[in-house]
From Swiss-Prot:
One GO MF term attached to the UniProt entry: structural constituent of ribosome
Function per UniProt: One of the primary rRNA binding proteins, it binds directly to 16S rRNA central domain where it helps coordinate assembly of the platform of the 30S subunit.
Subcellular location: Plastid, Chloroplast
Keywords, ordered alphabetically: Chloroplast, Plastid, Ribonucleoprotein, Ribosomal protein, RNA-binding, rRNA-binding
Organism: Glycine max (Soybean)
GO cellular component: chloroplast; ribonucleoprotein complex; ribosome
A GO BP annotation: translation
Record has rRNA-binding as a keyword: yes
Subunit structure: Part of the 30S ribosomal subunit.
Major localization listed first in the record, in broad terms: plastid
Name used for this protein in its record: Small ribosomal subunit protein uS8c
NCBIfam families reported for this sequence: PRK00136.1
Pfam families xrefs: Ribosomal_S8
InterPro entries membership: Ribosomal_uS8, Ribosomal_uS8_CS, Ribosomal_uS8_sf
């Protein structure tokens, strides 16, 4: 049974978010780096830095929270894995789903790399639907 690195990073982020941790440390791979760059660019993550520990590299993410009227902090990061190793989901550029009417993003793995749904529609290419983020 293989590892699903995308599901692992989604789980790391979701668990840190539920426990109200400000930072989460995820293992560094090329795929995780590309997904984290998208999260940073789209404003779902506040800061990212690369960290080395015992000859292994990690990405340390600072999660973004918004302050509620009552003074408590509320996260606004929801992630859902779509295509799994056992069931791959592909979509052409015309059928890429819109999350919350365009408020969320879909991360796709295309022949030109990992990108968001908006970028894939602009370049008119489809690919494997990795996850939804809203």
């Amino acid at each position: 049974m293989g590892k699903d690195t995308i599901a692992d990073i989604i789980t790391y982020i979701r668990n840190a978010d539920m426990n109200k941790k400000g930072m989460v440390q995820i293992p560094f791979t090329n795929i995780t780096e590309n997904i984290v760059k998208i999260l940073l660019r789209e404003g779902f993550v506040e800061n990212v830095r690369k960290h080395r520990e015992n000859d292994k590299y990690f990405l340390v993410l600072t999660l973004r929270y918004r302050r509620n009227r009552k003074g408590s902090y509320k996260s606004f990061l929801n992630l859902k894995r779509i295509s799994t190793p056992g069931l791959r989901i592909y979509s052409n550029y015309q059928r890429i789903p819109r999350i919350l009417g365009g408020m969320g993003i879909v991360i796709l793995s295309t022949s030109r790399g990992i990108m968001t749904d908006r970028e894939a529609r602009l370049e008119r290419i489809g690919g494997e639907v990795l996850c939804y983020i809203w």
